Amino acid sequence: GLESRGLGDVYKRQVYDYPIHQNDILPTVAEAAGAQIPNDRIIDGKNLIPYINNEIKTPPHETLFWISGRLKTVMHNEWKLIKDEKINKNWLFNLSNDPTERNNLAEANPIKVSELELMLFNHMKEQSPPVFQSSLSIPVLIDKHGGQEYVEGDEYLYWDN
């Protein structure tokens, strides 16, 4: 969600509960500032102002994607798939039933994994190649903060910078 702090009386402080993406910042700030968005390229984000002002009642995104090297995520409606291609592992969560992502449903739901993988594949085909390749790939423990040590059996994934 989003917490907006107002711009005078125009946009009062409020909390917005639907998922948004960092790509939404540019179109939203540009609209608030009265600036033009470049039309010579695709801008992935959406202007959130009509959503925040309840002019549009539906969520701004049905599907969101995050890509960091070999770590890829797609969130579609209530489902979220995280793929770590380095260790060939998937995590699938039903966010309606498991908002804190504790119960990996990937093995029990191979059809849903395949559906989301196809969405991710199609999204990746539309993307420009990275300008810079990752220079670092580090293991990150799942559900542990950086000060906690790895214990045999802990789950982890690899994050590419």
Go through each PLM region and give its residues.
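Long, internal low-complexity/basic segments
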Residues: 25, 77, 88, 100-161
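Conserved beta-strand positions that form and line the central face of beta-propeller blades
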Residues: 1, 15, 47, 91, ...
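Short, surface-exposed beta-strand/loop micro-motifs that present aromatic residues
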Residues: 70-83, 91
